[in-house]
Amino acid sequence: DLLERIRHAAHEAHAAVNQFYGVDLPYSYHLDGVAELVARYGGEVCTRAEDVPAVMFGAWFHDSIEDARLTYNDVRKRARSLGLDEAQAFTAAEIVYALTNEKGRTRAERAGVKYYEGIRATPYAPMVKLADRIANVRFSLRQASDYNHRMARVYREEWPHFLASLWPATDDPRMGLPQEMVLQLCELLGVDGKGMFED
């Protein structure tokens, strides 16, 4: 099964660099959380069946350039080797590249204006980034460590800027944010999402 091959390859890429999520969870925990959200809500923005493998690849591999020492070309080749066609591999690699943080000394430098411009310009990247944030917020809220409590506060403080930075500037559904995902993140952060999608 194509999706299972993609999932397994993403897990292996992060395991190969001994990356963990939190203190002791395998990084696959986070990757699966992001992919599960994309699979559940992606139909709202994924308008073509042939894009599904690329979007799911993007979800599972979204941190692979940043954390697993892969290059853009590595990602594209990996997608092809797993069974995506050339167009799908390009779409997948573009999502992963868009979600790769910039070089920077601070969080603000690593995810600045240019970073979010790249996400907004890349089909399906806004949704995958939103899924990534939801997965990270969920995890932070469930953990007892000071670090995770601090990150939960950071995510809450960043919320207005984060949403504004992801909000689509086009009617292209591929750049959209599934309404249910946005409202889910609002609920997790304890912020009011009423009226957000009203004309």
Kindly label every feature range from the protein language model.
Residues 1-199:
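Active-site helical microenvironments for divalent-metal-assisted chemistry
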